[in-house]
Amino acid sequence: MSELLGVAVLGAGHMGADHIRRVDQVVSGARVAAVADPDAERAKEAVGGIGGTGRITVHTDVEAALDAPGVEAVLIASPGEAHEEALLAAFARGLPVLCEKPMAPNSAGALRVVEAEARLGRRLAQIGFMRRYDAEYRQLKSLLDGGRLGRPLMLHCVHRNVSSPPHFTSAMLINSSVSHEIDAARWLLGQELSAVTVLRPRPSAGAPEGLLDPQLVLFETEGGAVVDVEVFVNCGFGYEVRCEAVCEAGSARIGAAHTMMVTAAGGAREEVPQDYLVRFADAYDREVQSWVDATRRGLVTGPGTWDGYAAAAVAEAGVRALDTGVRTPVDMAPRPSLHDRA
């Protein structure tokens, strides 16, 4: 492996461009070797934005980027429907991968990725559930694992966005937005989610016509805990993520510290972040740095393909619960030995 890990970044949109900047200017031990995007001009703009013209190759084809000189690892930040194919192409080349969520558009595709990796006999992919790298979430995880508050009984979660993009559907509140809470709950509690119920309040006047927003999503775990998630993607005021763990001997709450108090003529007010890239900027930096460090040691240490599959399976059950209005069990395949818990 070279002194700087050569990374091919797939996707040069909002997330991809941010990762191109991050690998080039923030993390240590890595460099951007290639960028691929179907829109060549967008890819060139992202590369030019970091002064990479001439030293970073630009491609419209994923496989060409994977085969570009100096590529030793892959960061997938393309649209979700392209992730499965890109992951399998990286596996075929033995390239380590950091893949943004979703790992695949559905659980069937996610399971194919899990099975392909299992056939290799070693982990190659880390999935981008960045909340595991957020300082507050890590502090809460440490507290729960330490047992000081007794067993966790409930998680109360809030996930709010300023507004939803034009293509957003009611199902996407679950399989796009709440997928982060799905992984966070599994990780914090150390349990699989076993059933989902979705309650549908009267839609907000600020929601686009036909969008069921907000929703209240209730998860049950295999260990008997309950997780509730308020998801509201057109709240209008900011990006807000909170979580409270209610345990036998106390509770712990995170997420309230990410506002800024502004004092000006006429008074003082709190300002809420407007974007997830602002709220979780440090978590993204730690996530990518951790991936680079582990990859340079020949390891995969973060959330893996099984976590990507589990999130997809739970989200599918959630969408069925949204459509039917009834409690829906989560149907999951057996966990491969490659992903057995330690």
Swiss-Prot record:
Signal peptide: none annotated. GO terms for biological process: inositol catabolic process. It catalyses: myo-inositol + NAD(+) = scyllo-inosose + NADH + H(+). It holds the Pfam family GFO_IDH_MocA_C3. GO terms for molecular function: inositol 2-dehydrogenase (NAD+) activity; nucleotide binding. InterPro entries: Gfo-Idh-MocA_inositol_DH (IPR050424), Gfo/Idh/MocA-like_OxRdtase_N (IPR000683), GFO_IDH_MocA-like_dom (IPR055170), MI/DCI_dehydrogenase (IPR023794), NAD(P)-bd_dom_sf (IPR036291). Keywords: NAD, Oxidoreductase. It comes from the Bacteria. Its EC number is 1.1.1.18. Gene3D superfamilies: Dihydrodipicolinate Reductase, domain 2 (3.30.360.10), NAD(P)-binding Rossmann-like Domain (3.40.50.720). Coiled coil: none annotated. Homotetramer. Involved in the oxidation of myo-inositol (MI) to 2-keto-myo-inositol (2KMI or 2-inosose). PANTHER family: INOSITOL 2-DEHYDROGENASE (PTHR43593:SF1), PTHR43593. Belongs to the Gfo/Idh/MocA family. This is Inositol 2-dehydrogenase. It comes from Streptomyces coelicolor (strain ATCC BAA-471 / A3(2) / M145).
